């Protein structure tokens, strides 16, 4: 699947300019001369494809399409037939990273300057959101003769996009009120609930949709479909929890940093380790850390001290345990209804590596 996935990505987002109808509905440019279409195709490629390819070509783990393809195979389907949709899931994720990097003013992604740093904010935002529409093209390419199934897949995908945007909205607005309450009272329940919900929506919804795709494409029964969706959500949520931890130590690939260390602390975010630290640090120490996190002018040394404290108090360990517990619960439910297949263990191993084998997003 890995090699073919790159081919499917290139089919949806070609590395060279295409006819304008790769991007806009057929007939819109009818009657225009070939030279005009060539110029339009070049401009659309520069404004829509190149910013996305910048991030796609930088690598990434491709775990979302990989897991969905493996789930399709476990269920007796042919993942290669649905390769374009698996690729479109990766493109949607890539687009969300581009938008997220603008919102966080991140300088680095996958070891390269972020898309907005290279192409500008306006282009990165437009190209990033345009990547969501690759799924519609992929469904048309794959299921042109099955509008009912295509409609069900679009419903699942759009529901995931709505959830992801709601999660991002919660992430942007932050959980400062709840964190302030936790610091004042020592009660972390509210802030933990909101951080968990944000993670489920922002990071769990799209993998859940991918696993729902696997169920729909293979005609799985309702119990199995629900278990697949729950497992996909668990994998995505657990991945985000461990990503919160990875932000404290940095993420490297072949010895190079793939993104800036401590971005969450620098951006004043309330993360899972910070929320779990409420019950693991003395009240005065917690107050000092929280004051640094919410102060935009805090020094790099102060921020480094926050990261060290969150690691030393055991909050990061608790996050890893929570991620594992999520995975185990969802897997136990799924395994009980999966068909017998030698690929079942492979699916499980891939999920655990996804969550705990941190390299690049």
What are these regions (language model features)?
Residues 1-94, 98, 102-117, 171-189, ...:
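Conserved N-terminal diphosphate/IPP-binding helix and adjacent helical/loop segment
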Residues 2, 6, 64-65, 92, ...:
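Hydrophobic faces of stable alpha-helices that mediate helix-helix packing
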Residues 13, 17-21, 161-174, 280-286, ...:
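Proline-centered turn/helix-capping motifs that create local helix->coil transitions or kinks
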Residues 37-88, 134, 138-139, 192-235, ...:
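Alpha-helical phosphate/pyrophosphate-handling elements in metalloenzyme active cores
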Residues 107, 246-256, 286-293, 345, ...:
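A glycine-biased, small/acidic residue-tolerant capping/turn segment at secondary-structure junctions
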Residues 109-130, 181-202, 226-230, 252-280, ...:
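Divalent-cation-assisted or electrostatically stabilized phosphate/pyrophosphate-binding catalytic cores
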Residues 118-119, 129-145, 155, 178:
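A glycine/threonine-rich phosphate-anchoring loop and its flanking beta-alpha core
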């Amino acid at each position: 699947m890995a090699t073919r996935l790159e081919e499917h990505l290139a089919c949806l987002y070609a590395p060279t300019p295409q006819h304008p109808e790769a991007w806009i509905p057929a007939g819109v440019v009818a009657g225009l001369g070939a030279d005009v279409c060539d110029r339009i195709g070049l401009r659309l490629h520069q404004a829509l494809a190149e910013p996305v390819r910048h991030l796609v070509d930088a690598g990434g783990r491709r775990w979302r399409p990989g897991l969905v393809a493996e789930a399709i195979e476990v269920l007796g389907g042919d993942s290669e037939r649905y390769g374009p949709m698996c690729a479109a899931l990766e493109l949607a994720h890539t687009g969300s990273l581009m938008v997220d990097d603008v919102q966080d003013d991140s300088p680095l992604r996958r070891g390269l300057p972020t898309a907005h740093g290279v192409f500008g904010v306006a282009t990165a935002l437009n190209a990033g959101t345009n990547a969501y529409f690759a799924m519609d093209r992929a469904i048309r390419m794959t299921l042109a003769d099955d509008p009912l199934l295509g409609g069900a897949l679009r419903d699942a995908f759009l529901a995931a996009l709505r959830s992801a945007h709601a999660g991002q909205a919660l992430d942007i607005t932050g959980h400062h009120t709840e964190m302030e309450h936790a610091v004042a009272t020592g009660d972390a329940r509210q802030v933990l609930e909101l951080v968990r919900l944000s993670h489920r929506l922002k990071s769990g919804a799209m993998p859940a949709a991918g696993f729902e795709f696997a169920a729909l494409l293979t005609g799985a029964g309702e119990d199995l479909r629900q278990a697949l969706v729950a497992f996909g959500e668990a994998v995505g949520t657990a991945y985000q929890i461990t990503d919160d931890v990875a932000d404290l130590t940095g993420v490297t690939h072949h010895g190079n940093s793939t993104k800036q260390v401590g971005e969450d602390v620098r951006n004043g975010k309330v993360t899972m380790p910070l929320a779990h630290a409420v019950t693991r640090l003395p009240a005065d120490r917690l107050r000092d850390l929280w004051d640094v996190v919410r102060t935009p002018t805090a020094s790099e040394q102060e921020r480094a001290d926050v990261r060290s404290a969150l690691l030393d108090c055991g909050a990061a360990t608790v996050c890893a345990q929570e991620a594992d517990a999520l995975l185990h619960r969802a897997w136990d439910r799924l395994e009980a209804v999966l068909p017998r297949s030698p690929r079942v263990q492979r699916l499980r191993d891939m999920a655990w590596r996804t969550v705990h084998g941190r390299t690049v997003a």
